[in-house]
């Protein structure tokens, strides 16, 4: 951890309200990029970004300094993103599906399908980037997370492993599989 990070962490521990602003200014673009690559949706990435900084500012005392401040934020963002991906994997139910009134457990669908039109996806013109994004989205979440952190965000294998709470050798195996 460099001197600048130490000063910022001390200010966060003291509850300095400007320290959170500094934290957001310093890391928001990197965290947003990770969240976007994990989810593939700008709106969800923004929500993850907000959740990450809320969690970080409220839980600053939990930061022990064993890693860099950026690595800690990546971990929070990755955990938030993976939780969202897990929620998304719940079965979806079309709105037209008949409801069995006798079986109350099937009365409410677990998750409705999102049919919203996303103009950003439609206007993507770079075919290579689109193909890469599509390929990343098809990866299972455990492989996607390590791939995004190391190969797209530029973290070292060791740093990506720290963020995900796995060993460096496990990260290498996951990268190989991705």
Residue ranges and their predicted role:
Residues 27, 174-177:
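Residues within the DNA-recognition helix of helix-turn-helix
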Residues 13-22, 32-51, 168:
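Short, charged helix-capping/linker segments at alpha-helix termini
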Residues 33, 47-54, 67-79:
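Structural recognition of an alpha-helix C-terminal capping motif at a helix-to-coil junction
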């Amino acid at each position: 951890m460099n001197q600048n990070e130490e000063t910022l962490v001390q200010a966060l521990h003291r509850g300095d309200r400007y320290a959170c602003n500094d934290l957001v200014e310093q890391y928001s673009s990197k965290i947003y990029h990770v969240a976007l690559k994990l989810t593939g949706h700008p709106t969800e990435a923004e929500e993850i970004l907000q959740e990450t900084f809320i969690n970080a500012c409220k839980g600053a005392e939990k930061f022990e300094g064993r890693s860099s401040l950026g690595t800690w934020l990546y971990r929070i963002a990755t955990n938030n993103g993976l939780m969202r991906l897990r929620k998304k994997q719940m079965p979806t139910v079309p709105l037209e599906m008949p409801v069995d009134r006798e079986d109350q457990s099937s009365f409410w669908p677990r998750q409705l399908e999102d049919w919203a039109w996303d103009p950003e996806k439609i206007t993507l013109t770079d075919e290579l980037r689109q193909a890469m994004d599509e390929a990343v989205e098809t990866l299972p979440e455990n492989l996607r997370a390590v791939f995004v952190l190391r190969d797209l965000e530029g973290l070292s294998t060791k740093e990506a492993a720290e963020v995900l709470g796995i060993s460096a050798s496990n990260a290498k195996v996951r990268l190989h599989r991705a």
